[in-house]
């Protein structure tokens, strides 16, 4: 029997019935369940629901076969961070607002979950960013983007960028986003970056509020090594990986490249990225 770990976030009470229906369907199938501690607290305290589980988890155990993430895109990114290099397949169940990264909506999940249990699904791989600081720390990973941002609100920072050790430009801006195809519909998009189809092997460099009008988003192959060095009046800057923030001194440079592993996303039904754009981003809609 496949073992499933469930991660989630606190939800609105009207979604409680759908959440319980999904977990009960897994219980009825005899699925060994491991539930994240904070999410289990929500189930027990807010929904008065006490599922039969094999264990309470804070991090993802190695023996898990599948991961179910119940939440929005923020919860999905947090779960992807938990999965790390293990490449355990993850199913996203949307209980948030947009749910661009998730596969199914909460109200339909209990009907579709038998496909997961029967092995009737496909796997879609998503590329990740590997981010290494030159201070000797271990690499970190991001599904959507790595953002270099100013720490103080009053002045810009300068981000010097090199591609494969070839100098590109100095970005005088509020920051610079390096996004994967998955992240091209997130922070990068708000900076007028292009939307990149998930199967494309590219990264996009998108400046945030650049000082110069001729600093535009740039698409590069994902086998490019991107080195970033920062100059700032505050002597520090922010490194943000999928919403996880660290403060670094300006003498710390960053190397970004494609990670050697991918994120494996479970698809319970045929998936069309074009349909997702139309449905969730109102792509091409005549809004008047």
From Swiss-Prot:
GO cellular component: cytoplasm
Protein's organism: Porphyromonas gingivalis (strain ATCC 33277 / DSM 20709 / CIP 103683 / JCM 12257 / NCTC 11834 / 2561)
Alphabetized GO MF terms: ATP binding; metal ion binding; NAD binding; NAD+ kinase activity
Homology family: Belongs to the NAD kinase family.
InterPro entries assigned to the protein according to its UniProt record, in alphabetical order: ATP-NAD_kinase_N, ATP-NAD_kinase_PpnK-typ_C, NAD/diacylglycerol_kinase_sf, NADK
Protein name as annotated: NAD kinase
Signal peptide, first to last residue: none
Catalytic activity: NAD(+) + ATP = ADP + NADP(+) + H(+)
NCBIfam families the record matches: PRK01911.1
Keyword NADP set for record: yes
């Amino acid at each position: 029997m496949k073992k499933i770990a469930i991660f989630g976030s606190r939800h609105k009470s009207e979604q409680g019935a759908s959440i319980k229906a999904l977990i009960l369907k897994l219980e009825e199938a005899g699925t060994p369940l491991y539930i994240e501690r904070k999410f289990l607290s929500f189930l027990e305290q807010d929904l008065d629901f006490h599922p039969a589980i094999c264990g309470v988890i804070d991090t993802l155990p190695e023996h898990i076969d599948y991961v179910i993430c119940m939440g929005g895109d923020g919860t999905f990114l947090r779960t992807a961070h938990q999965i790390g290099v293990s490449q355990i397949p993850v199913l996203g169940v949307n209980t948030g607002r947009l749910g661009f990264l998730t596969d199914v909506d909460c109200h339909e999940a209990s009907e579709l979950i038998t496909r997961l249990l029967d092995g009737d699904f496909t796997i879609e791989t998503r590329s990740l960013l590997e981010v290494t600081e030159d201070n000797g720390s271990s690499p970190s990973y991001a599904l959507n983007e790595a953002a270099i941002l100013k720490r103080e609100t009053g002045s810009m920072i300068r981000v010097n960028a090199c591609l494969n050790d070839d100098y590109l430009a100095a970005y005088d801006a509020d920051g610079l986003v390096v996004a994967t195809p998955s992240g091209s519909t997130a922070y990068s998009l708000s900076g007028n970056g292009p939307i990149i189809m998930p199967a494309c092997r590219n990264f996009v460099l998108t400046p945030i509020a650049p000082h110069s009008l001729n600093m535009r988003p740039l698409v590069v192959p994902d086998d490019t090594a991107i080195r970033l060095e920062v100059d700032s009046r505050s002597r520090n800057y922010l490194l943000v990986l999928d919403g996880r923030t660290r403060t670094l001194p300006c003498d710390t440079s960053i190397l970004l490249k494609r990670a050697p592993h991918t994120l494996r996303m479970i698809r319970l039904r045929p998936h069309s990225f074009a349909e997702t754009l139309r449905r969730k981003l109102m792509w091409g809609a005549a809004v008047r």
